[in-house]
Swiss-Prot record:
Family annotation (PANTHER family): FATTY ACID/PHOSPHOLIPID SYNTHESIS PROTEIN PLSX (PTHR30100), PHOSPHATE ACYLTRANSFERASE (PTHR30100:SF1)
The entry's keywords: Cytoplasm, Lipid biosynthesis, Lipid metabolism, Phospholipid biosynthesis, Phospholipid metabolism, Transferase
Similarity comment: family membership: Belongs to the PlsX family.
EC number: 2.3.1.274
Purpose: Catalyzes the reversible formation of acyl-phosphate (acyl-PO(4)) from acyl-[acyl-carrier-protein] (acyl-ACP). This enzyme utilizes acyl-ACP as fatty acyl donor, but not acyl-CoA.
Matches recorded under Pfam families: FA_synthesis
Primary localization class, coarse: cytoplasm
GO cellular component, one term: cytoplasm
Taxonomic path: Bacteria, Pseudomonadati, Myxococcota, Myxococcia, Myxococcales
Name of this protein: Phosphate acyltransferase
Biological processes per GO annotation: fatty acid biosynthetic process; phospholipid biosynthetic process
Length: 361
């Protein structure tokens, strides 16, 4: 996407491979013209920059932060007690307008706490959510929440759907995103009290709500936004990651089992590399937060330089769309949608529209 923006603030001390891999990813992004400000202990960050021969001509700067949030730290307490930690300083830069967004591979709970504490929420937003981009057969469907809110109420799912619709449309360019709630079946009677109440409300929302989807639908690309509570979403995400790893290992063993299979593997190497790249979580880079007054991306704790570079790029892309400006307007009717109509229970709103295949582009 085009257009100049303020730099992306990157937590240089977040993640299992910090600061080395984080700094390398930031340098790689800067070499491609993406402005970056690295946040962390200045001497240590500059030492890493020297190792990567990051010259002064790059759009890259260092902003000091004297404290670090460790993975074992309590998120809320760390934000309050370590006021100069690298995560909080990143958000301070975003809040002041000196950064267009932030990226951290550190303590995800601390990132969420920092976002709420420093940036705040758009008017009407009950709880922010973590969004994941799924490696589907077609398109780039979103799934939320992925762990921010494990115990949800119907209002949370309704707002997740409305915020996800905005992100899909504004950031991913989907003209009319199809929204579904993850459930144990497509029938209206399936699900829980939580999902049925949310579904009844979303049928009245000004969005393309297509009802329930099942776990088998997550990677088909038939829907653009999949809504669930943070507990279920996180379990589903980790299940997909584990499945991809096991399938990859099975494939590797099969291609090495005989001479013929080894030859077949060599002949199909390009196709296999393309598939590997498609399902590689590092290509996504990070999971955006929605429901806060700023752009924030949470990267995997195991992120390497490639993942950080891609997270910086995606944070910049999101910042350019100014999607946050629309969030408050999108969630404004959410409470009214949950009110039970005078002529019947919320669950009795007629049949849910069935999904149809997306138009070919």
């Amino acid at each position: 996407m085009v257009g100049k923006i303020a730099p992306i603030a990157v937590d240089a001390m977040g993640g299992d491979h910090a600061p080395g891999a984080i700094v390398q990813g930031a340098v790689n992004a800067a070499r491609k013209g993406l402005p970056v400000v690295l946040v962390g202990p200045e001497a240590r960050v500059r030492e890493e920059l020297a190792r990567h021969r990051a010259g002064s001509s790059l759009p890259l700067e260092v902003h000091p932060a004297t404290e670090v949030v460790e993975m074992h730290d309590h998120p809320g307490q760390a934000m309050r007690r370590k006021k100069d930690n690298s995560i909080r300083v990143c958000f301070d830069l975003v809040a002041s307008g000196r950064a267009a967004g932030m990226v951290s591979a550190g303590n995800s709970g601390a990132v969420m706490a920092g976002a709420i504490l420093v940036l705040g929420r758009p008017e009407g937003v009950e709880r922010p959510a973590i969004v994941s981009v799924l490696p589907a057969l077609k398109g780039s469907p979103l799934m939320l929440d992925m762990g921010a809110v494990v115990d949800c109420r119907p209002i949370h799912l309704v707002q997740f759907a409305l915020m996800g619709e905005v992100f899909s449309r504004r950031v991913h360019g989907v003209a009319r995103p199809r929204i579904a709630i993850l459930s144990n079946g497509e029938e209206d009677t399936k699900g829980t009290d939580l999902t049925r109440a949310a579904a009844a409300a979303l049928r009245r929302a000004p969005i393309d709500f297509v009802g329930y989807c099942e776990g088998r639908d997550l990677l088909t690309g038939e829907v653009d936004v999949i809504v669930t509570d943070g507990f279920t979403g996180n379990v589903a995400l980790k299940t997909m990651e584990g499945t991809a790893k096991v399938v990859g290992e099975y494939l590797k063993r099969a291609l090495r089992s005989t001479t013929v299979s080894k030859i077949g593997g060599l002949l199909s190497k390009a196709a296999l590399e393309g598939m590997k790249k498609r399902i590689d979580w590092r290509e996504v880079g990070g999971a955006p937060l929605v429901g806060v007054n700023g752009v924030g991306f949470i990267s995997h704790g195991r992120s390497d330089a490639l993942a950080i570079e891609n997270a910086i790029r995606r944070a910049g892309d999101a910042a350019r769309t100014h999607f946050i400006d629309e969030i408050a307007r999108a969630v404004a009717p959410s409470h009214a949608l949950l009110e039970v109509p005078a002529n019947g229970a919320a669950a009795q709103q007629g049949p849910t529209p069935r999904r149809t295949a997306p138009p070919q582009t």
